[in-house]
Amino acid sequence: MQIGSGTNTYEWQDSWASIPESESARDGWAHHGVTVTESGQIITYHPGDPTMMVFDPDGTLVRTFPVELSDAHGITLVNEGGQELLWIADNGRKRLPGLGYDYPGGETKGQVLKMDLQGNILARLTRPHLDVYREGMYSPTWVAINEESY
């Protein structure tokens, strides 16, 4: 199957990656970010479990590491002082089977994490203290970084 259009047309490879099997992976919603390291490894989030996955270009799972996230909606890779780091936007909630496009009820815990490639948390940005978020939801979906700032 081809996806995209024009110069951005790609061949869909349905069985490219070996995703660790779990009940949550079969039923989990997956529309999270993907990034590629300087060495060509692909980093993404498990469709059901709070786990980051690192694949080689052939789709072989190289390693995983647990993360304190509901979902890794947006993943941005930066090179800071010669070290590759991840910025991950967690919208604070995860869709569940049987709810269609609705999210489960309850408080959301949106956050942005800055991590190294081993999974160590270097910074955590939580709900900003702004009037708009006092009663509203904080649900970040992507991170933009000004790499000239470091």
Language model regions located:
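Short, solvent-exposed coil/turn segments
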Residues: 9-11, 29, 108
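A short beta-strand motif characteristic of beta-propeller blades
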Residues: 14-24, 60-66, 123-125, 129-133
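Asp-box/WD-like beta-propeller blade repeats and closely related beta-sheet repeat scaffolds
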Residues: 69-74, 78-150
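Beta-strand-rich domains and repeat architectures in extracellular enzymes and scaffolds
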Residues: 14-50
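Short coil turn/linker residues within repeat-based beta-strand modules
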Residues: 10, 49, 58-61, 119, ...
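Short, solvent-exposed loop/edge-beta patches enriched in aromatic
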Residues: 35-50, 56-60, 69-70, 79-83
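Hydrophobic/aromatic beta-strand positions that recur at structurally equivalent sites within the blades
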Residues: 54-55, 115
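Blade/loop signatures of beta-propeller domains
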Residues: 1-15
